[in-house]
């Protein structure tokens, strides 16, 4: 209860008055859980909570509650991904959902800084380890089947999330380049059908980072964006009537050097927009579309919290919970998991009518 109350206070402040990193003392300290995880996805199934994250064959943790204690119980895959590209041993940014008794774990394979990527899926009748079947790639960018079709010829196909509306599934994905996209899944929730003429929706795009780094000069066209770096990724869509909320991880992610951090404000932060349609357009508090660089800053670095992101939303009996990972200023190489209540009744998603 202390953890939830403290985090709720934090979000009452941060959601209503977007706290800048330059004023870390204005935000309470986040209460850490015992779970070290990057890009978590959390579900409630069979009377327990399961967290899936980046790690060998997609690591699974289990806990009796969101606050833990968390215990590593195994992995989704029992061997490397069958997709022949990227980091097959440690797939990125998994998202797990349950539809009609089947569990679907969507994952990414890629190499850092390049868009020769793919999103795959594994299925099981149980949320825990064992019994998962790897079905391979759903969509690909850079190379592979369908990668020359719109929008896959301009996106980085990683960071999957799936929104379910009725009996329909919508695959949300993207990182840097042209930003965040959504395409419809087939009824099997494991394929998108013919990629030619696919009904794709553009959801968000970063306006461009002016600062130049070595990646901008990479001779491989799949490992640079000639229009400039556009750091937005990790999208997730939640629903709280009457709006759909598009949550984004905005800024530079991962592998921070505590002695050489990015310029203030360029590290990960959580932003959001909303729409009455699951396909957008999503707008921020000022009415700016997220495809035009909009996005309300909900939570950024403060106190000892550095670069929060990799967020998702889970609905429990008490309401909607936003979970995310973050690093510590003093030791920014590990990602920690925590969560906070979302209070829509108080207007604390920054959309105060």
UniProtKB/Swiss-Prot annotation:
Keywords: Carbohydrate metabolism, Glycoprotein, Glycosidase, Hydrolase, Polysaccharide degradation, Secreted, Signal, Xylan degradation. This is Probable arabinan endo-1,5-alpha-L-arabinosidase B. GO terms for molecular function: arabinan endo-1,5-alpha-L-arabinosidase activity. It catalyses: Endohydrolysis of (1->5)-alpha-arabinofuranosidic linkages in (1->5)-arabinans. The active site is at residues 39, 233. Endo-1,5-alpha-L-arabinanase involved in degradation of pectin. Its preferred substrate is linear 1,5-alpha-L-arabinan. The record marks 159 as: Important for catalytic activity, responsible for pKa modulation of the active site Glu and correct orientation of both the proton donor and substrate. The lineage of its organism: Eukaryota, Fungi, Dikarya, Ascomycota, Pezizomycotina. Belongs to the glycosyl hydrolase 43 family. It is found in: Secreted. GO terms for cellular component: extracellular region. It comes from Aspergillus oryzae (strain ATCC 42149 / RIB 40). Residues 1-16 form the signal peptide. Glycans are attached at residue 194.
């Amino acid at each position: 209860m202390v953890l939830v109350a403290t985090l709720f206070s934090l979000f009452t402040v941060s959601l209503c008055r977007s706290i800048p990193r330059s004023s870390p003392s204005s935000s309470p300290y986040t209460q850490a859980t015992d779970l070290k995880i990057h890009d978590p996805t959390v579900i409630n199934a069979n009377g327990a909570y399961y967290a899936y994250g980046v790690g060998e064959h997609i690591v699974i943790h289990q806990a009796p509650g969101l606050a833990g204690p968390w215990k590593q119980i195994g992995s989704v895959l029992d061997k490397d991904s069958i997709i022949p590209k990227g980091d097959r041993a440690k797939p990125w940014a998994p998202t797990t959902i349950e539809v009609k008794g089947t569990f679907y774990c969507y994952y990414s394979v890629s190499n850092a800084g390049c868009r020769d990527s793919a999103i795959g899926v594994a299925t099981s009748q149980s949320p825990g380890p064992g019994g998962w079947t790897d079905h391979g790639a759903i969509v690909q960018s850079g190379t592979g089947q369908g990668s020359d079709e719109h929008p896959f010829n301009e996106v980085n196909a990683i960071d999957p999330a799936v929104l379910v509306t009725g009996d329909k599934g919508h695959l949300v994905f993207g990182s840097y380049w042209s930003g965040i996209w959504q395409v419809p899944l087939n009824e099997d929730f494991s394929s998108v059908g013919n990629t030619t003429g696919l009904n794709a929706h553009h959801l968000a795009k970063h306006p461009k980072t002016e600062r130049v780094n070595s990646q901008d000069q990479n001779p491989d066209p799949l490992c640079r964006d000639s229009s400039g770096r556009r750091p937005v990724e990790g999208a997730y869509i939640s629903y709280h009537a009457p709006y759909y909320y598009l949550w984004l991880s905005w800024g530079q992610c991962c592998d921070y050097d505590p002695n050489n951090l990015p310029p203030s404000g360029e590290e990960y932060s959580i932003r959001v927009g909303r729409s009455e349609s699951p396909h957008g357009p999503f707008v921020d508090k000022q009415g700016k579309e997220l495809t035009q660089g909009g996005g309300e800053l909900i939570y950024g670095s403060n106190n000892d919290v550095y670069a929060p992101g990799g967020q998702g939303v889970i609905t429990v009996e008490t309401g909607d919970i936003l979970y995310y990972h973050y690093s510590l200023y003093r030791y920014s190489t590990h990602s920690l998991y925590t969560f906070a209540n979302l209070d829509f009744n108080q207007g604390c998603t920054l959309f105060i009518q």
